[in-house]
Amino acid sequence: MAGNTIGQLFRVTTFGESHGLALGCIVDGVPPGIPLTEADLQHDLDRRRPGTSRYTTQRREPDQVKILSGVFDGVTTGTSIGLLIENTDQRSQDYSAIKDVFRPGHADYTYEQKYGLRDYRGGGRSSARETAMRVAAGAIAKKYLAEKFGIEIRGCLTQMGDIPLEIKDWQQVERNPFFCPDADKLDALDELMRALKKEGDSIGAKVTVIASGVPAGLGEPVFDRLDADIAHALMSINAVKGVEIGEGFKVVALRGSQNRDEITAQGFQSNHAGGILGGISSGQHIVAHMALKPTSSITVPGRTINRMGEEVEMITKGRHDPCVGIRAVPIAEAMLAIVLMDHLLRHRAQNADVKTEIPRW
């Protein structure tokens, strides 16, 4: 099974299934001499961890990460870093009734068409449980980017259903279970989630992730454009159905005179491009948005077929998130960090000696 690795110089390979013994990943390309402990990774894992609020799945996993290799005396050695998280709260019996049934809106049908079989326990490899390892690997990248280059990566929920959320206060994001930057909308979000729980339904969401302090020059021409790699990374997250960089699809209604980011002696006067021009970072904030579909794991009856092709009605059992966008915030941060780390190392390898007289802001 291919497709388990992302990155060129900073490479992350994950393994494991939702109801397997453990999840793990190998992180290659981490420079030596970086102070690193399990506690450095645990903070973001706790932000993503299931069972931490009444609004998310009640599967209770401690998600305690173990560093198996690549760190000695508290610093990275430059060799492969092995990370492991044990699964401790599997309830595979919740899925025995669907082993011969394809859940609508899930990867059951496509995985069986591709491989001829599937791990039906919680979706197996297709489960978002796999993203715990991305968050752990991303925490390494976030630490390096912040400490060595002053790059800060922050994400938040910017829409749930038909409730838009303004980025009013970044500190507010860590003070509520929704990763919401708009305190005025917390009651509306709570009301929506209560209604969804009562109805047994789910809702979609929009997550925004922003990187500040990114130097100009990251990204490669044509096929490895920085925005293309960011879109690829974010689209690889479970349930993501759309990605925008900067103004995204809003540019359709704009004129060139409105959309271009004019430059004066004081710097850029706007950031409609989301910090990337021609696939290369401009030195402005990198801004990306992703849309997540409403999960299909709901208790509202739905039509599907079984492996014999017979039509059946099913209700999804188990413990699920009514809005998967909530816990996707630290995942989006991690994926953006992984891409930026990779491109920074690639840029340094080729262009470390490049000097220009062009102003930078």
UniProtKB/Swiss-Prot annotation:
Pathway the protein acts in: Metabolic intermediate biosynthesis; chorismate biosynthesis; chorismate from D-erythrose 4-phosphate and phosphoenolpyruvate: step 7/7
Annotated catalysed reactions: 5-O-(1-carboxyvinyl)-3-phosphoshikimate = chorismate + phosphate
Binding sites annotated in the UniProt record for FMN: R125, S126, S127, N238, A239, G278, K293, P294, T295, S296, S297, R319
Keywords: Amino-acid biosynthesis, Aromatic amino acid biosynthesis, FAD, Flavoprotein, FMN, Lyase, NADP
Cofactor(s), names only, from the UniProt record: FMNH2
UniProt remark on cofactor binding: Reduced FMN (FMNH(2)).
Subunit structure: Homotetramer.
Biological function: This reaction introduces a second double bond into the aromatic ring system.
Family, similarity comment: Belongs to the chorismate synthase family.
Protein's UniProt name: Chorismate synthase
Source species: Salmonella arizonae (strain ATCC BAA-731 / CDC346-86 / RSK2980)
